Amino acid sequence: MAKNIQAIRGMNDCLPTQSPLWQKVESAVKSVVSAYGYNEVRMPIVEETNLFSRAVGEETDVVSKEMYTFDDRNGDSLTLRPEGTAGCVRSCIQNSLINRDEQRLWYMGPMFRHERPQKGRYRQFHQCGVEVFGLDGPDVDAELIMMTARLWRELGIDKHVRLELNSIGSQEDRVSYRTALVAFLEQHIDVLDEDCKRRMHTNPLRVLDTKNPDVQAILGDAPRLSEYLGEESKQHFAGLCELLDAVGIEYQVNERLVRGLDYYNRTVFEWITDSLGAQGTVCGGGRYDGLVEQLGGKATNAVGFAMGLERLVLMMETLELTEVRRSVDVYMVAAGEGTMIAGMQLANQLRDTVEGVRVMNHFGGGNFKKQFKRADKVGAVVALVLGENEVADNTVVLKDLVGGEQQTVSQTEVAEKVAALI
């Protein structure tokens, strides 16, 4: 007997029992970004490897350890996208979107990283990303944070997330800070683990993000990045904080927050929850004012964020916020000669006249008891029963599966009756 083929480790099926909650999250995301006037962009899931090496950074964990990279038949190195910002920037440059005007864009789809699978961290995962090009003030940074706060309220999780902010300054600001930080770390080299020692020479700011408790303990005495910020970076961050204060969004300044990708500058932020254990970040973003030019476009200010949909779904499950709209409202029960086609016609009539109604026809035969059992199983609230007599009389038996009442009504008035019950 042939061995069953399994899904790749860390890449999961989304089953019919799970997809309604996913659809709820995705619908909320689309509703919120549309309310702010942002436009959708769709990019390929495969890009040239060089795009991520240049954008994300050769020394980042994402590029050095986690990417799914392969050579195609022409010998070109290609990579399944590990994140969305680089591809979005590439698309904007290639299609001249940011030569003419500012752009406010969003996208949603699968990303891929070869990580150790665990709860909230998968090898195929889904992100929604929002990116703004051509605006440099703290006002648009604040709008993106306000947008995410609105989404949390829509999903009912706003009391279970907290916002952390930081400014990592400009590239120029970080040069002198990097020197001071490396000098400090060298004084405590015996405390650093191998990963921190590597980061100290490749990207010292990433040491601030370590999860090693021994290293965290010494970082309390490390130089503070805020003391090395230039006046422009300080004013930008102060402006952002002032705007958030004005709209009542609470936040905590976390001077160790640096994010894991090299393209960030000035504002960085994360929304964090305690509901998911170690995988507590549900959304993160910041400014990347140099990335467009770095990838061959003209110098363009930019800011954005990405959120992990798996983590949002997990969070809602953990908080038992799983109520979703039923997948079937009306179940067509039919038995007898000529009833099947009549049932299909009546179902289509309902779909045409009752907005948003979800009607399922019974197929495969079976007595009324079997069909009603199926109606209960799919969660229908109304059953419409057609027998030979009903077909002849142009009527239908309407049964309220919640209240238990039933009545015989004309097929011309059934739409009104159904609309009142669902």
Swiss-Prot record:
List this protein's GO terms for biological process: histidyl-tRNA aminoacylation
Location in the cell reads: Cytoplasm
Q: Which InterPro entries match?
A: aa-tRNA-synth_II (IPR006195), aa-tRNA-synth_II/BPL/LPL (IPR045864), Anticodon-bd (IPR004154), Anticodon-bd_dom_sf (IPR036621), His-tRNA-ligase (IPR015807), HisRS-like_core (IPR041715), HisRS/HisZ (IPR004516), HisRS_anticodon (IPR033656)
An example of a Pfam family matching this protein is tRNA-synt_His
This entry carries the following GO cellular component terms, namely: cytoplasm
Reactions mediated catalytically = tRNA(His) + L-histidine + ATP = L-histidyl-tRNA(His) + AMP + diphosphate + H(+)
Key words of the record = Aminoacyl-tRNA synthetase, ATP-binding, Cytoplasm, Ligase, Nucleotide-binding, Protein biosynthesis
The UniProt GO MF terms for this protein read: ATP binding; histidine-tRNA ligase activity
Top-level taxon: Bacteria
E.C. designation(s): 6.1.1.21
What CDD domains has UniProt attached to this entry?
Answer: HisRS-like_core (cd00773), HisRS_anticodon (cd00859)
Question: Which SUPFAM superfamilies has this protein been placed in?
Answer: Class II aaRS ABD-related, Class II aaRS and biotin synthetases
Q: Which family does it belong to?
A: Belongs to the class-II aminoacyl-tRNA synthetase family.
Query: Which proteins does it associate with, and in what oligomeric form?
Result: Homodimer.
- What is this protein's name? Histidine--tRNA ligase
